[in-house]
Amino acid sequence: MARGPKKHLKRVAAPKHWMLDKLTGVFAPRPSTGPHKLRECLPLIVFLRNRLKYALTGDEVKKICMQRFIKIDGKVRVDVTYPAGFMDVISIEKTGEHFRLVYDTKGRFAVHRITVEEAKYKLCKVRKITVGVKGIPHLVTHDARTIRYPDPVIKVNDTVQIDLGTGKIINFIKFDTGNLCMVIGGANLGRVGVITNRERHPGSFDVVHVKDANGNSFATRLSNIFVIGNGNKPWISLPRGKGIRLTVAEERDKRLATKQSSG
């Protein structure tokens, strides 16, 4: 009989997008409980050791973290299995580097460097708006933040821009047709495009149709949509490829073209 929460995670059962080799060990780091779900996060240890190659072993990552060099969303994190997730800003004081966790078109977290200015804020999707004790309205975001007294114009599925220094909302983008969005779940994970229309299905899932910069259209559930810009101007910098997924043939042609130009 299982007593309490699970404490281990086998390597083969770890999320595919962590890109851990199957044969390098038996276990994978199990993320701590935190603002992002286990299968939608990237533990700090995987980011520092496997992505940035700043450490060779888990022990070395622990030594880096215990020196309080690593900040996530402006807060020092010493837990090596802390679950960083979509839109989180990871800052390394010592090297003066800042990263934002965003998806590439293959659905993996890209190592995306950002400027100091951009590291001061993050975008959050509004998941829920409720009225709490003594009639105080508050909203809950995708990364489990509770913000009291929001602007009454802000509704569920809108995106709020949060100042990481104060934790306050400084701006917001309405969920509306014609706005730029990124897909954060499903088969189109990581694609960026403009919302063309929304199909309402009462009692089921609303479907949103999106068109990318190349003119390709695709559809996904409303819950997978994260608005990232007004019109077609993103409020954050996008990783290489700008969220445009190429077909296998297009990827091949691109590779051949770069080969010929360099050769």
Swiss-Prot record:
Protein name according to UniProt: Small ribosomal subunit protein eS4, Y isoform 1
InterPro entries named among the record's database cross-references: KOW, Rib_uL2_dom2, Ribosomal_eS4, Ribosomal_eS4_C, Ribosomal_eS4_central_region, Ribosomal_eS4_central_sf, Ribosomal_eS4_KOW, Ribosomal_eS4_N
GO cellular component terms given for this protein: cytosol; cytosolic small ribosomal subunit; membrane; nucleoplasm; nucleus; ribosome
Domain of life (superkingdom): Eukaryota
GO BP annotations, alphabetical order: translation
Organism: Homo sapiens
TM annotation in the entry: none
Family statement: Belongs to the eukaryotic ribosomal protein eS4 family.
Domain S4 RNA-binding: start-end pairs: 42-104
UniProt keyword list: Ribonucleoprotein, Ribosomal protein, RNA-binding, rRNA-binding
Coiled coil ranges: none
Record flagged with keyword Ribosomal protein: yes
Protein encoded by which gene: RPS4Y1
